[in-house]
């Protein structure tokens, strides 16, 4: 199986990008298939058009590729800054457009118009979230969004949150150590 690594940060000089790039490079050097989803680099449009919502599927090539890669991967790694106690808008748009029926879950209707039964499709996947915060903030809202909402709905049970807090208060050595430990944990957990 493959590893899907999603990055939601516009700055290629950011710590988020460094973790994204180094994690992917280590996994690729090991011979793993790595799907890189750099949302800003790919110019992903997070806004779901009305026709896509009504059609319940997307014709956007990024959405199709991202959904296929998510399905092919045994480990999903999402890397993002913590902005206002949550992920950036581009990443919320990724969830809205990718986590649809047929990719993250299926719906079964016994009769037209009845409430559907939801079947999770990601239950065999491992998920790692890497969030970086400038201040010392709680991880509670990130866990509530990612673990308890998005991935619980899709059946994921193997979930880990790596949350670097108070970047402003850390020196370069502390940040470097945290980055090295994060990349090590992400690449060790993949095997």
For each feature predicted by the language model, list its residue ranges.
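Active-site donor-binding loop signature of nucleotide-sugar glycosyltransferases
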Residues: 39, 132, 164-166
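Conserved active-site beta-strand-loop modules that form the wall/rim of enzyme catalytic pockets
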Residues: 75, 128, 159
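Short, glycine-/small-residue-rich phosphate/pyrophosphate-handling segment
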Residues: 107-154
């Amino acid at each position: 199986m493959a590893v899907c690594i999603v990055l939601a940060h516009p700055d290629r000089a950011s710590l988020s990008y460094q973790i994204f790039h180094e994690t992917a490079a280590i996994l690729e050097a090991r011979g793993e298939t790595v799907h890189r989803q750099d949302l800003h680099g790919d110019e992903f449009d997070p806004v779901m058009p009305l026709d896509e919502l009504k059609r319940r599927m997307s014709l956007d090539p990024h959405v199709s590729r991202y959904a296929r890669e998510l399905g092919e991967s045994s480990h999903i790694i999402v890397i993002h800054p913590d902005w206002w106690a949550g992920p950036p808008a581009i990443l919320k748009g990724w969830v809205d457009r990718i986590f649809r029926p047929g990719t993250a879950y299926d719906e079964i209707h016994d009769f037209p118009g009845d409430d559907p039964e939801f079947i999770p499709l990601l239950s065999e996947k491992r998920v790692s979230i890497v969030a970086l915060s400038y201040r010392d903030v709680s991880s509670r809202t990130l866990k509530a969004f990612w673990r308890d909402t998005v991935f619980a709905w899709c059946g994921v049970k193997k979930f880990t949150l790596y949350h670097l807090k108070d970047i402003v208060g850390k020196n370069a050595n502390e940040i470097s150590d945290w980055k090295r430990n994060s990349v090590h944990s992400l690449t060790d957990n993949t095997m």
